[in-house]
Swiss-Prot record:
One of its GO terms (biological process) is rRNA 5'-end processing. Belongs to the YqgF nuclease family. SMART domains: YqgFc (SM00732). Its EC number is 3.1.-.-. One of its GO terms (cellular component) is cytosol. The keyword Hydrolase applies. Keywords: Cytoplasm, Hydrolase, Nuclease, Ribosome biogenesis. It comes from Gluconacetobacter diazotrophicus (strain ATCC 49037 / DSM 5601 / CCUG 37298 / CIP 103539 / LMG 7603 / PAl5). It is found in: Cytoplasm. Could be a nuclease involved in processing of the 5'-end of pre-16S rRNA. This is Putative pre-16S rRNA nuclease. Its main location: cytoplasm. PANTHER family: POLYNUCLEOTIDYL TRANSFERASE, RIBONUCLEASE H-LIKE SUPERFAMILY PROTEIN.
């Protein structure tokens, strides 16, 4: 299944369907869920990153339970905006995941999303390092998905 842009994903969604945002990290995959009006992204949770078939099965369960019609994953572009090895690996992973889950997918620039979330948690929430680690993945997914929703709002 090919990757789509955000406008195409929005156009493919059925009535009352949501988007599931993914922020894949080394150990975990942060998850965020849009509302059905595609205006607001909320943190949803995190999955342990492992075998693709196991991750895909869990995402299929979440998609069925929450009415998800498409996936949006973070795209780790280089700081200068170039498409490097990390972006290529993320793209390949997302194409494979989309095929296994059976949902259309798009990717969105995630540069600095984790940094922005960490900064907010340190400055505004005064959280311990351990508590921040528990929250940062799903909050980064929400931050990335919200950026995609805002940039493509109609």
């Amino acid at each position: 299944m090919p990757l789509f842009n955000m406008h195409q994903i929005r156009g493919q969604l059925g009535r009352d369907q949501r988007l599931l945002g993914l922020d894949p990290g080394q150990k975990t995959i942060g998850l965020a869920l849009s509302d059905v009006s595609l205006m607001l992204a909320s943190p949803y949770g995190a999955l342990r990153r492992g075998k693709l078939s196991v991750v895909a099965a869990e995402i299929r369960r979440i998609a069925a339970r929450e009415g998800v019609g498409g996936l949006v994953s973070g795209l780790p572009l280089s700081m200068d905006g170039s498409f490097g090895p990390a972006a290529q690996a993320a793209r390949d992973w997302m194409i494979s995941l989309s095929e296994q889950v059976g949902l259309p997918a798009a990717m969105w620039d995630e540069r600095l999303s984790s940094s922005a979330v960490n900064r907010m948690l340190i400055q505004d929430a005064d959280m311990t390092r351990q508590r921040r680690a528990e929250l940062v993945d799903k909050l980064a997914a929400s931050y990335m998905l919200q950026g995609a929703l805002d940039a493509t709002a109609e």
